[in-house]
UniProtKB/Swiss-Prot annotation:
PANTHER family linked to this entry: HYPOXANTHINE/GUANINE PHOSPHORIBOSYLTRANSFERASE, XANTHINE PHOSPHORIBOSYLTRANSFERASE
Highest taxon listed in the record's lineage: Bacteria
Pathway annotation: Purine metabolism; XMP biosynthesis via salvage pathway; XMP from xanthine: step 1/1
Protein location: Cytoplasm
EC identifiers of the protein: 2.4.2.22
Subunit structure: Homodimer.
Protein known as: Xanthine phosphoribosyltransferase
Binding site for 5-phospho-alpha-D-ribose 1-diphosphate: A128, N129, G130, Q131, A132
Organism annotation: Oceanobacillus iheyensis (strain DSM 14371 / CIP 107618 / JCM 11309 / KCTC 3954 / HTE831)
NCBIfam families listed in its UniProt record: PRK09219.1, XPRTase
GO biological process, one term: XMP salvage
One Pfam entry name: Pribosyltran
Amino acid sequence: MELLKNKIIEEGRVLSDTVLKVDSFLNHQVDPKLMKQVGEEFAKKFRNTGITKILTIESSGIAPATMTGLELDVPVIFARKRKSLTLTDHLFTAEVYSYTKKTSNEISVSKDFLHEDDIVLVMDDFLANGQAALGLLEIAKQAKATVVGVGIVIEKGFQTGGKQLRDKGIRVESLAIVESLSDGTVRFKEEARI
């Protein structure tokens, strides 16, 4: 998605060979026009799959998932990272390790919202080592829901998450795949092959 790639180049900041900061438009401040186009793009990719729910994780997955849900006219469920006083039992849970924050979180979704007859699109802002996506897939599995794929805004193609999911036969659609962040420069997958 060219608009997204341009935004990454213009506003993204490479903090290291593995860390890309995009907080000016995706995971702190959100660019609604960009998110609308992200939603439209994912809707095009998954429109004919019969999706009944979109499953994401708080908090940075919520904006792209919501815009996709709006385009597909389906509800969005977000897994919580912290226990809520109103969300105590009757939960699907999974353990997710964050390499960025170096912490492990138990994520949870109420059993009231995810069911065996649901057809689910899993979404997140980033795919790096795949831990968040695997946690969301585990929750969908516990619900006995059918997963049609994983939608990712930015995939770090140089990390193992995308390969790990694809090797399991999971359809992964990423709007931008970053092949390298070396030398402080963002290189996308298509550019690396030229």
